[in-house]
């Protein structure tokens, strides 16, 4: 896997270490009689999966709640990427066990489900260690949730971690328009799952399975539904998204990620496209050209490299060298000069010497990153790296991580400060923190706040950057030169294209 940890603006490695924990919840409609609480950890794929689980259960009478104590069904949608992932889940289950006992005593039975990659990896062990769990379901079989919940009503303690032959996407239900609108103007769309790379530090091939790609028509249908309910930006996601290899029934030919994005970009009403996460080895010429040729494709790319040492890259089974990555970056920047880059780094991989670590720092200096995620290597059971005898001392790993993060933070702040005084096209997404304020995202995924009318939510507007804080910008809304937006947020495709072409010409220092 390439390192599925993309996030708009990584506030710190500590926030990244928190695994983007997201608790989903909304006000219950009166027509529903049961309440659902979903807590999702990890990558964007888990956010997408959590939404699909809620959509599957809505016809069963479940409405989401933000309070676990109000729930009839609690789902922990877990991630297995980081250190001690399973133990964190068991710690959370300990709290839920007490909650379940309290609710049971009050005459309100509660079901607990463990889903996601920890469920896939641990399986029966979860039931053995925590008797309060009713169901364990893997990421490739959660489309069976309604049926499985009916079964656990009579036989608690079920495990379904199979990799079924049928495509789970054929069984997922489309969300209701009001639910899409509630989730905002941006949405994730899974186009690819699994990974065939087998990096020696990574569990994803074992928990998510082999690479599979959805058909083009199914993806376009999902995006069309999202656009109709107000979505203006989609992020195409996959564990190794640029390995996408679908089929396009319109052309009768195989489809790449680049050709898929061209189809998506042509859909009326959609303003922006992003994709994540990518592996350098699958960054083909057509995908690089897409950054030049598709105005709606944002100039931000998360492309994990993990290390700057050829020796460590070989030990990680990355199948590329540091020089290959640097050449790739040069080609991408030649195609899209204003592109901002993000990456993942692992320090303290077994066998890493001080010289290997210095090579990583040198690569960072040479590339210049707008943002990045960085981690100490942690042994993942069942992966080749975990069995190596040359493990690095924890103190050494901590020291190296601190040095690396200091350099990355310096680059991030320099990138953000370079935006002050510039005019950026901002997609406004929601009301801001204060009255009269609206919040949005720049093309580079930074959060931005400006004084403006809520009618502008769902539109792209030019904003002058006034201040650059550690994690967000403050800007001044400018009058559009391409015509007025409607209150519904419909924007002319021509105006958007001109704005993004102008943005493309800006030199972005790092």
From Swiss-Prot:
Residues 181-414 form the Radical SAM core domain. Residues 1-25, 484-510 are annotated as: Disordered. GO terms for cellular component: cytosol. It is found in: Cytoplasm. SMART domains: Elp3. Keywords: 4Fe-4S, Cytoplasm, Iron, Iron-sulfur, Metal-binding, S-adenosyl-L-methionine, Transferase, tRNA processing. Its cofactor is [4Fe-4S] cluster. InterPro entries: Elp3/MiaA/NifB-like_rSAM, Methylthiotransferase, Methylthiotransferase_CS, Methylthiotransferase_N, Methylthiotransferase_N_sf, MiaB_methiolase, rSAM, rSAM_horseshoe. Residues 417-479 form the TRAM domain. Coiled coil: none annotated. It is an enzyme of class 2 (transferase). [4Fe-4S] cluster 1 binds at residues 43, 79, 117. The keyword S-adenosyl-L-methionine applies. Binds 2 [4Fe-4S] clusters. One cluster is coordinated with 3 cysteines and an exchangeable S-adenosyl-L-methionine. Residues 484-493 have a biased composition (Polar residues). Pfam families: Radical_SAM, TRAM, UPF0004. GO terms for molecular function: 4 iron, 4 sulfur cluster binding; metal ion binding; N6-isopentenyladenosine methylthiotransferase activity. Residues 34-154 form the MTTase N-terminal domain. Monomer. Belongs to the methylthiotransferase family. MiaB subfamily. Catalyzes the methylthiolation of N6-(dimethylallyl)adenosine (i(6)A), leading to the formation of 2-methylthio-N6-(dimethylallyl)adenosine (ms(2)i(6)A) at position 37 in tRNAs that read codons beginning with uridine. This is tRNA-2-methylthio-N(6)-dimethylallyladenosine synthase. It comes from Beijerinckia indica subsp. indica (strain ATCC 9039 / DSM 1715 / NCIMB 8712). The gene is miaB.
